[in-house]
Design a protein with these regions (language model features):
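A post-motif C-terminal structural segment
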Residues: 1-182
Length: 182
């Protein structure tokens, strides 16, 4: 059985927790539904373990944590880690009711060289207060605000040979603006 969020288009990935619309299911809600469906169908829908040993396996992946770390997006990584933690909480509630029949394994698959936010032996500051002001992921920014930023320059006249609407970085935008002001 594969549970798919009904609001996702085609095979799209879930959005980061920080970007998730109210209509989308959280990882915890998907975990809750999976447990209810798999356990509730046992033994004629009575939700009790039988002696035949029929059990079930659920894998819940907080895969967007890794995506956020690759993007160096601290708040998206933190938000999706908390989202995954909430899903684990749902599984733990099931465990509390069925401790002899339940095994929960939580592991990281390859997020071992991720980003560093501050370091104890340097003067680098983490600016956590600024992180709390972040309202969406870098991916959301890139897909939405950056496109609007580029569109604002689409009709700009510029002495350089660059088409401002094709720029893909703020550095390139700055260089274009500097060359236009010369």
């Amino acid at each position: 059985v594969i549970a798919i969020n009904p609001w996702l288009q085609n095979s799209a990935a879930m959005p980061y927790a920080i970007d998730r619309p109210e209509s989308n299911l959280s990882l915890a809600e998907m975990t809750e539904v999976a447990i209810a469906n798999l356990y509730g169908k046992k033994n004629g829908g009575k939700g009790k373990w039988n002696r035949r040993g029929d059990g079930f396996f659920i894998m819940v992946e907080g895969g967007k944590i890794d995506w956020a770390c690759h993007a160096n997006d601290a708040m998206a990584a933190i938000g999706d880690t908390l989202d995954f933690d909430n899903a684990i909480g749902v599984a733990l509630e099931f465990y509390k009711k069925h401790p002899r029949e339940t095994l929960i394994v939580v592991t990281g698959d390859h997020e071992t060289g991720g980003m560093t936010i501050g370091h104890a032996t340097t003067a680098y500051k983490a600016y956590y207060d600024r992180l709390l002001e972040q309202e969406n992921s870098f991916q959301y920014f890139n897909d939405n605000q950056w496109a609007a930023h580029k569109a604002a320059y689409a009709d700009a006249t510029c002495p350089s040979d660059h088409d401002p609407s094709t720029l893909e970085s703020n550095t390139a935008m700055l260089e274009l603006m500097e060359s236009a002001s010369v």
